[in-house]
């Protein structure tokens, strides 16, 4: 009986919803931030979903490279959509609450797509390595079946990693404050709110995040080191310039993405600054998904040619 009373008392004090404090509590900034992030989100959807449609309808783009790009666009649109709409609503609404299960769902889907993007970027580096290092063997090294398996593995790994993090985070007790000092449900602010011992969670998160990010970064670095060596051996100066141009834009995007992830999740817990982290979070949840279609695709001659053809046929 005593145990039942303790459990009942604990359940009465446990948190059933959270309050997302958002980016700023200054009411004068709410409207400006809403308009700005709405425009960015719309550009994100147009760019990424447009890229998916373009690759789908143009037969010339039905190759492994563009299958990867299409998957990346889907992931960018998805992980931004798991955060941005709720952020936009909270910028204009007085009630900034999110239910316990809603917070868990947002946490899971955001983590799934973010993890999937890490793996996809590594797979795309391997794809570029195979295409430049040995073009004759490229159809064998990255066949349609292998491409599908690489992408499916990326999604499964991302979802599995997010499931572990979500299960470990939301099994904790939240019986004190329910005010999340962030604009979405993220790991550091949630762990700070928990009244359970979060030491083990911190170790597991650090271990999994370190393994995923470092292994993906190593694949990218090794792939591009091999690409760099292969490009230097090219007899054509024009071919070298084209290859270096493609690699430079890709490496810039990878550096921005993994740099922000490393900064956010692979630091000691004691060094977290919520205000600083919110700014960095805006960068990789809102800005990077908009930049990726430009960096990866719109600088590509095949994509621009396909886009002109579609516009000429259906609009002009």
Curated annotation (Swiss-Prot):
The record, for Gene3D superfamilies, names: Rhodopsin 7-helix transmembrane proteins
Pfam families from the UniProt entry? 7tm_4
Family matches, as SUPFAM superfamilies: Family A G protein-coupled receptor-like
Q: Which residues form a coiled coil?
A: none
Keyword Transmembrane helix tagged = yes
InterPro entries xrefs: GPCR_Rhodpsn (IPR000276), GPCR_Rhodpsn_7TM (IPR017452), Olfact_rcpt (IPR000725)
The UniProt keyword set, sorted, is: Cell membrane, Disulfide bond, G-protein coupled receptor, Glycoprotein, Membrane, Olfaction, Receptor, Sensory transduction, Transducer, Transmembrane, Transmembrane helix
Give TM segment ranges: 35-55, 57-77, 105-125, 136-156, 211-231, 246-266, 279-299
* Record-stated family: Belongs to the G-protein coupled receptor 1 family.
Entry function: Odorant receptor.
Quote the protein name from its UniProt record. Olfactory receptor 5AP2
User: Which organism's genome codes for this protein?
Assistant: Homo sapiens
Question: Organism classification, top ranks?
Answer: Eukaryota, Metazoa, Chordata, Craniata, Vertebrata
Q: Which gene encodes it?
A: OR5AP2
């Amino acid at each position: 009986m005593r145990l039942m009373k303790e459990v009942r008392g604990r359940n009465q004090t446990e948190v059933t919803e959270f309050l997302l404090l958002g980016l700023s509590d200054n009411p004068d900034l709410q409207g400006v931030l809403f308009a700005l992030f709405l425009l960015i989100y719309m550009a994100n959807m147009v760019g990424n979903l447009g890229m998916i449609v373009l690759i789908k309808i143009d037969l010339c783009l039905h190759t492994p490279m563009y299958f990867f790009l299409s998957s990346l666009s889907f992931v960018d649109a998805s992980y931004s959509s798991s955060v941005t709409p709720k952020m936009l609503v909270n910028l204009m609404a007085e009630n900034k609450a999110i239910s316990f299960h809603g917070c868990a769902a947002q946490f899971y889907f955001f983590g799934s797509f973010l993890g999937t993007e890490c793996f996809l970027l590594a797979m795309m580096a391997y794809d570029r390595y195979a295409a430049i290092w040995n073009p004759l063997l490229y159809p064998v090294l990255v066949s349609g079946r292998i491409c599908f398996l690489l992408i499916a593995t990326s999604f499964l790994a991302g979802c599995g990693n997010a499931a572990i993090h979500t299960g470990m985070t939301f099994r904790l007790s939240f019986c004190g404050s329910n005010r999340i000092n962030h604009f979405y449900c993220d790991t550091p602010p949630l762990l700070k709110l928990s009244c359970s011992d979060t030491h083990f969670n911190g170790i597991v998160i650090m271990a999994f995040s370190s393994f995923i990010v470092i292994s993906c970064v190593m694949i990218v670095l090794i792939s591009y080191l091999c690409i760099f060596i292969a490009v230097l051996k090219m007899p054509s100066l024009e071919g070298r310039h084209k290859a270096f141009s493609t690699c430079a834009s890709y490496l810039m995007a990878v550096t921005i993405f993994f740099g922000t992830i490393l900064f956010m999740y692979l630091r000691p817990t004691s060094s977290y600054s919520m205000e600083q982290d919110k700014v960095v979070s805006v960068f990789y949840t809102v800005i990077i998904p908009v930049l990726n279609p430009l960096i990866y695709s719109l600088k590509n001659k095949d994509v621009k040619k396909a886009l002109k053809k579609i516009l000429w046929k259906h609009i002009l």
